Amino acid sequence: MKDSSNLLEMRNISKEFPGVKALDNVTLKVKKGSVHALMGENGAGKSTLMKCLFGIYHPNSGEIFISGQKVQFKNSKHALDNGVSMVHQELNQVRERNVMDNLWLGRYPKKGLFIDEKKMYDETEKIFKDLDINVNPRDKVSTLSVSQMQMVEIAKAVSYKSKIIVMDEPTSSLTEKEVSHLFKIINKLRKQGISIIYISHKMEEILEISDEVTIMRDGKWIATEKASDLTMDLIIKLMVGRELTDRFPKKDHIPKETILEVNNLSDAKNELKNVSFKLRKGEILGIAGLVGAKRTETLETLFGLREKGSGDIILHGKKVDNSKPFKAMQNGFALVTEERRQTGIFGKLPIDFNSIIANIDSYKTSTGLLSNGRISKDTQWVINSMKVKTPSQKTLIGSLSGGNQQKIVIGKWLLRKPEILLLDEPTRGIDVGAKFEIYQLINELAKEDKGIIMVSSEMPELLGVCDRILVMSNGMISGIVNANQTTQEEIMHLSAKYLSVTGGVNNANQIKEKV
């Protein structure tokens, strides 16, 4: 007999792929009008379970019940038509069409033979008003922020009269204010009796918004608990199967002499204003700041992705020309970008291609063809040295967990033997166990005398991994602090230092470095 309080029951779900048992007898029960968090390390089976619910995969065994009725969705459209929606981490929208087109694509309201644009507009406006979404239905999607695009996807789910909405890492690219707005919308949906399955690695958010939490590990159900009964330490223990006594590895690298000097660096748009700092060999230099501080822009200017306006980049005491990425690469710089899926990997291509793409010319033989032997050897080096979990070099990189994808992105750059490694949000979208492995890798690279500059929005990460932290505010440096002598409060204070400044430049002489 099914529990009438459960809107969704997935019972004993198993799913196998060639050589891999992705799900092993997993049960998930979600109450009506609740927020049910689904947690686990990358590769735990969360996405596979949701794809079984959404009709993308068909389980080898097990049953799915919605409102007590057994269902078996043929595909995602079948799931949508029956009240199950999914808001993907990679937002699936037609950017050059307007908002209401995206909302009603493939099911436009008709007036005779023609699309009823007035009805489409009115219906969209009504949903937006109900959810407190401040977006014009006639605006092009390409003009929206990531947060607004996400709201449109949620509105689309509501337009399908969904009873269950799956949200996959919904806050990964949102500001604190946008997260707060999202939570207000989730609470409105909850009051309407809609159930939310919320997938995230951000434990603070999980504990704030969720009613219940289900934790998975290695394709198995581990526990389902009330969120109010959980702590971050207990969640970590359940996720990884062991206690993590330290979230960060011991800093056992020793910074040496200065390797890089950046003097009065500004970009051509003058969004960066006279940024100056030094980086030592074997040092991990963090960059902190609020959204809009121009942290990513700093890395992009150093790497030649963004046009430099003025200033000098000095490596080993000599000025270098990093006006283009290929020149920066020749000068020993490497950049791991923030948006891994968009700019870091070729998701539909195999691991071997993704491992050698940054150095592809070096694999050409005298005939102009690529040396498959050398490609295989170097790919295996990346897999082994980065501890990538994969069945084959030919596995599509897009099928790997976020942590394994990021290891390959870092590994491809290490094949070029860079001296300066620029890391932009290197652990974004990566689970707690894989994060620790990335931290260990960064520490090992520092021990090999690489100079590392790391942007992160996670304050504990900067304090736990870095030697010094450069704080930015409104495109300017507001302070450089020693990581083991500062606090989150001091960094936040420095982050807000120039928020009222609309012009002018930063006086480097006013910066007090705590070293």
Swiss-Prot record:
GO terms for molecular function: ATP binding; ATP hydrolysis activity. ATP binds at residues 40-47. Residues 8-243, 254-499 form the ABC transporter domain. InterPro entries: AAA+_ATPase, ABC_carbohydrate_import_ATPase, ABC_transporter-like_ATP-bd, ABC_transporter-like_CS, P-loop_NTPase. Part of the ABC transporter complex MglABC involved in galactose/methyl galactoside import. Responsible for energy coupling to the transport system. NCBIfam families: PRK10982.1. The complex is composed of one ATP-binding protein (MglA), two transmembrane proteins (MglC) and a solute-binding protein (MglB). This is Galactose/methyl galactoside import ATP-binding protein MglA.
